[in-house]
């Protein structure tokens, strides 16, 4: 009879309802785990200079848009101070991690240049098509549409200049001095970059971007420093690193770039300049008729995964536009998923053991199995409902989040003991508690619980609002656990306890 009264109680029905929803959510959607459990990558990104909160928010939003376009799930972008952003991605493959890094490093400043004149920028890109493979030209292509104004400007510039080179750049080293080896310098002057035009690549980039190119032959660091006056930085391409030290001592910002083992000198130049092309002006484009449909192509076999990834990165960057500041990768941390698998097993075992120990302690304290079992049941229900809600909203469970669940459950057990003690009251001496006394004591117990919960929620809300990283996960699950306890499990336990304890004669 008592169990019938318990099961038909409204608050117990609410508890059962949420339990069913949680079980369904866990079965259909499953839990998503954070970086420290599932493994993945954590990238510390440095902005080129400190920024205000508004600019930092722009960087955060732009990065989120870019990275989400890649199709990678569960990306977390967290500003850290005024010059750093931390990007965390769980359950990521090596290929996806490489794409993420390349996409982050791109500021995304686009220029289209002809004969040293910039005729289009990122603002002129109206639409970006899907990446595809062009078997006719053996290249991965990224088609996009330029504004009418940019197309008309190019048509005027290219009139009668069929065969001339058109260059497209993403993040060129504007206002820099390039100190290059002899082989790099000769390649930059070659017909490969000049095509049938009358300006070398060296001349075009200096006119368009103020990039000075200095061949490193019979030239001293002092002479290079004199040439580089007014440049934002000096970039050494395929040049001995000893020069870098001498220039840094003179106060210059110096970067050193070397050729990869799998690239030739021409690909190295393109990578260093952010150059796509040069593309040859066709006979049709040299007639003066504007065309808004253009494309960036990356010549490679269809089986070249690296080229396809590069094309996808270009597509993402063109779609999302340029970032307000340049970013650089400060640190990359890879976390193995094997550690997380072991941890999940340990947490499961520890959770079951903790539940049994709590039940045993409650039983030893009250000497009543009918008190220990409801306490264990409501604690287990609370965990299940919290996990069910986390599954529904796709919240990443990391170590601090799990710590928050444990904290909430610990608080929950304390509150159930408060309810139990209030209901028992003087029962041991009187062996009878009137209904009015039960209600009064229940009210007193819930007043204590609400006061404690309010304090916890206020404190955790501060952490959730003003802190980043693991503290937010801890605060979120703690608040969620407290709310589940106040509105679902604690009222249900109170009703169960009233029947089993408060009205026992």
Swiss-Prot record:
Family: Belongs to the SecD/SecF family. SecD subfamily.
A GO CC annotation given for this chain: plasma membrane
Pfam family name, one: Sec_GG
Chief subcellular location: membrane
Membrane topology: Multi-pass membrane protein
UniProt entry tagged with the keyword Transmembrane helix: yes
Function: Involved in protein export.
Keyword field contains Transmembrane helix: yes
Taxon lineage: Archaea, Methanobacteriati, Methanobacteriota, Thermococci, Thermococcales
Record-linked InterPro entries: SecD/SecF_arch_bac, SecD/SecF_CS, SecD_arc, SecD_SecF_C
Name of the protein described by the UniProt record: Protein-export membrane protein SecD
UniProt gene name: secD
Keyword entries, A-Z: Cell membrane, Membrane, Protein transport, Translocation, Transmembrane, Transmembrane helix, Transport
Assembly with partners or alone: Part of the protein translocation apparatus. Forms a complex with SecF.
Compartments, as annotated in UniProt: Cell membrane
Regions that span the bilayer: 6-26, 346-366, 373-393, 399-419, 446-466, 468-488
One GO-annotated biological process of the protein: protein targeting
